[in-house]
């Protein structure tokens, strides 16, 4: 693969990346009058400042929902769709280094956002700058669009699309090389049910993360422990609580994770048969493809459905289950919803659609896909075919956009996990 990036530019890139990683840009809605939190506002402003230093023209939405950096000339607009918000760091004890300090450990940079998506976003910016410095002439304007709400509801891009110029083509550097031409539909659901005076329980952090911890601190702890032992789940124990341990993964790869909420619910439901626990244990179970609920749902372009039971809250007043479902591009979403409503109702749970993103599909023979694949293969010699994904990137927010990079085939995927890292 040709190397067009000079060493001094690489050093500048790493310094800039360490700077923007240092902002803990996790959603904190409404903080200090910002839409999504002060740290998100600050990292947006800092990233645009860095872009201006590289020669880009910048703009920030007056309300702080998004910003962009643009360079070049031409009538056509190519968008590079990025985001600067990140998922929570989770339990700091699981990190070898502070998550918001971007520490170099051997050949890796470790920190929240180095893979998803601060690292790829900044790498693409410096790549364009390096090409321009080498005298490469572009016939299109290139606009880096920086979203701030990708990990939750995409309100940043909703606002952008209401106001701003639409791109003619583009890509999101928020997946893997060579290219993702199909992304499953993303349905996020909350199921509301009755509370319980004697069952305080809260587990899971984000809907798009397989929960790796679920803690019970109720008075029936002594009854629960032998049930957990018999189930075979991994857990840790303190004097007054027990925490079931799982393996965190992105929801799109839920089948590769171990869901701690499911592990706890299957045992706890045997001694406290609360409707939410019974739904999880009996109707869902450990299968992360949703087959127990829906039957086998799959298609040729995008593969199996992915089902992540991501959050659970039970208190005196109510219970709430949060679910993330990645729906194959040819599947019938409404039929799935009808089935989920029916089963949930039988457990006294009321369905609420929290968020939905329609699937992405750009044909393999389209000019965009053909061009990007040709460039990738010429530069790398790698003949890995274009692929589909259960992930949801900003590529689906605009017409004629795909996910392009930034992980190479075989690279370790650590986004949304402790010790998120990228090779440097």
Show which residues each predicted segment covers.
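N-terminal helical capping/dimerization or prosegment-like subdomains
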Residues: 1-82, 86-90, 322, 424
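Buried hydrophobic packing segments
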Residues: 121-131, 160, 218, 264-268, ...
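An extended, acidic, His-containing surface patch that forms the Zn2+-binding/catalytic region
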Residues: 252-308, 313-316, 326-338, 350-424
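Short beta-strand
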Residues: 58-62, 234-238, 309, 386-387
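Active-site metal-coordination/substrate-binding segment of hydrolases
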Residues: 77-146, 152, 417-423
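Midchain, well-structured core segments that form catalytic/ion-binding scaffolds
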Residues: 151, 157-328
